[in-house]
Amino acid sequence: MARIRFRGCPITQFASILPQQGANPPRAKGVVNLSTKKLGENSVLDTLLQSGSSKCLFPRASAQGLDAVLLNTAGGVTGGDSFRFTANAAEGTTLTLTTQACERAYKAQPRPYAQISNHLTVSSGARLNWLPQETILFNGSALDRRLQIEMDPDATMLLVEPLVFGRAAMGETLTDIRLRDRIEILRDGAPAFLDAMRFSGDLQAHLCRPHVANGAGAMALVVFASATAEGQLAPVRHLLPDTAGASLIQNDMLVIRMLAKTSFALRRALMPVLRRLNNDTLPRCWML
């Protein structure tokens, strides 16, 4: 059997394929920018730019709003990857954004983080639904994720960010991760909501503390900014499990925090709440 030589070394099943010292392995990068416009009574696509490992799909829908599905063709993120997404829901339009599958934060090298940056704007009289599926953290992952939403005073926004701590079905525990996560909502240019966390080290031990998460394997944040938010408080509380809570931080902003033992339990608890806050509809990607 012939052997191929590389830099003076034969390549066989025993050869090392580790990168040379100082080499920069290839990294995934993706960019999507999109905006909507009004066409008659319907919300339609106005502009779209996509490049690299980020793609956007637009399933056909009979509703008057525009649905967009984000796709990471790299299959996940790891240290050094960079993904940027921007979207603008123009005046009077409705835009629903989701992901084709769960995002996965894989084990990273010691130094670089995976970077995910999302920037959304909601114009006057518009509605934006930010409904990504779960982000799953793998042991050894390093993720820096930022979401900023800028709203006009009379805009409406529904947001969910579900986070899963390891693959429970495979017995994975997160004993070594790095996580930076920041969610910021601005209304009329002024800060209306800020949620930020940073962690490095043994997340499993931290989550097992009774006053932190009591061993939960997944969590979610839901924010509903709307003139109807106050009227949704009592009905939403009725739908929540014992490991979740809802409160009004402003008369027009409802915040829900939820813990669950597994990602399946989390989604099962989230779906009726999101349906309630989204006119009894959900993207088909969310179906169990």
Segment roles from a protein language model:
Residues 111-173:
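Internal, conserved structured core segments that host functional sites
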Residues 2-134, 139, 275:
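N-terminal, charged/glycine-rich beta-strand/loop interface patches
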Residues 163-288:
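A structural signal for small-residue-enriched, beta-sheet-centric alpha/beta enzyme cores
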Residues 89-91, 99-101, 122-124, 132-134, ...:
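Short, structured patches in soluble enzyme cores that scaffold and shape functional sites
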Residues 28, 50, 114, 141, ...:
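A short, structural micro-pattern
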Residues 54-58, 106-111, 140-142, 168-172, ...:
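A short, polar/proline- and glycine-enriched secondary-structure boundary/capping micro-motif
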Residues 32, 83, 116-118, 126, ...:
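One face of beta-strands
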Residues 94-96, 127-129, 156-158, 220-221, ...:
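Structural motif
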